[in-house]
Amino acid sequence: DNVKKDELILSSRDQIKGKVNFEIKTDSLLQPQIDILFQKMLPILHPEDIVTSFNWKSIQDFKELFSCRYGIILDHEDALFEAKSLSIHDEDMFFMVERTLLDSRNFDLPLNRTVIWTVNEKNDFVHFLDMGAFGVITDIPDTMHIYRK
């Protein structure tokens, strides 16, 4: 009753309709804490959701337990080689790729499993979708929504 009109309090995942991108940040956590975080998250996942993280190890460790899509986040060119190897060995893995990495001569990930962030130019937005990217994320959703096929 004390909730402001523009404030939403979630007590259940069922209150959220549609797809959710759970971007798990683990920078300040120790491995046992990371494991607990991932274990606690498992029961709230829906098949249409996606779990992503810069913590590739945890995504790999828990991928068999996810009831939804999963992926790794890349923001530097050095990560492209290892990500390419993962893309060959794990056909279910998605890749959340920082926009500038698409311009790298080393970019060779499957576009149908690649989500590009952050794209705020309409022409780039449309171009990436036309290229066959799985999705594009923007900081300006009022102008462009998060598109997914």
Describe the residue ranges of each PLM region.
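C-terminal active-site rim and adjoining tail of enzyme catalytic domains
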Residues: D1-L8, S12, G71-K149
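Metal-dependent phosphodiesterase/phospholipase catalytic core, i.e.
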Residues: D1-E77, D90-T100
